[in-house]
Amino acid sequence: MTEPTTPAASAVHGGPDAPIAVLHSRIRIEERLLLEEFDRRKVAYELLDSRTAVFRPDELRLPYRGALSREISHTRNVYATRILEHAGLTVVNSHDIITTCGDKLLTTLRLLASGIPTPRVMVGLTPDAALDALDGFGYPAVTKPLTGSWGRLGARLKDHETAEAVLEYKAALTGTQHQITYVQEYIDKPGRDIRAYVFGREVVGAIYKYSDHWRTNTARGGRPQVCPVTPDLEKLLVATAEAIGEGVLAVDLLEGPDGEVFVNEVNHTPEFHGAIDVLGTGMVGRYADYVLGRLDPR
């Protein structure tokens, strides 16, 4: 690893021996595992901390051959990846994927445009408008912020009284994302979700996430177990990847009471340390294989 630097206007575009920029702000378990894999393969990389990076778009020349984004701030991720692409770099994941998957409504629209089965959604441009329409949409339902992870600020709306209390609270919050009210039908799932990992158009593996709570995120204590990748599931996952774009994706799916499978969300900077506990550490190597294949095409 080379020492991190602040991008400067005087830097030159990197050639095939130049380092890969690893965009980040925190080094979590996933980033550490990927960097250890790069070290093992003697891959040159440079840590690019989004909290200190400064760019000059009018004189942008960067000393990298490509970039891997593992940034956890959605806003910084969106703008940094666009700047890196403006400099002519291939970025995994791309600005388009990060912009789309980082916004639940944009993800839903992309899925619907490709005919991917996804839960019914209603969008109110104000919380009050959403509340007025919910009786027709139907209860129970789920409201989520447009951006965010780990199920934070998501709420299950059992009835009108619950919705009134939750949406009144949302209306008092500042920020545009709290005013745009994204409501999804509640899927009565069998105590579990599915998370599947797709690198490019290859399904790497899938896990069930079991929980007694309606939110099954492993970060919230969801228990992972191996999920068999059936031909039907693989077909759905590949179609989802084609709809979103080629990259490193974690696809969250819900099983309905009649056996239907819905794509719920698509994650662009996925955590995977819980998955490798059941799928094995080979996932890290395949992640690195995919990134290097995109950045160093032969």
What are these regions (language model features)?
Residues 1-97, 296:
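ATP-binding N-terminal substructure of ATP-dependent carboxylate-amine bond-forming enzymes
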Residues 267-280:
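Glycine-rich phosphate/pyrophosphate-binding beta-alpha loops
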Residues 156-244:
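Phosphate-binding site of ATP-dependent enzymes
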Residues 31-35, 80-82, 108, 131, ...:
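Short amphipathic alpha-helical segments and helix-helix/interface helices
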Residues 2-4, 14-17, 24, 60, ...:
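Active-site nucleotide/adenylate-binding loops and adjacent lid/helix of ATP-dependent enzymes
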Residues 141, 182, 204-205, 249, ...:
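Protein kinase-like catalytic core scaffold
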Residues 215-263, 285-298:
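A long amphipathic alpha-helix within ATP-dependent nucleotide-binding catalytic cores
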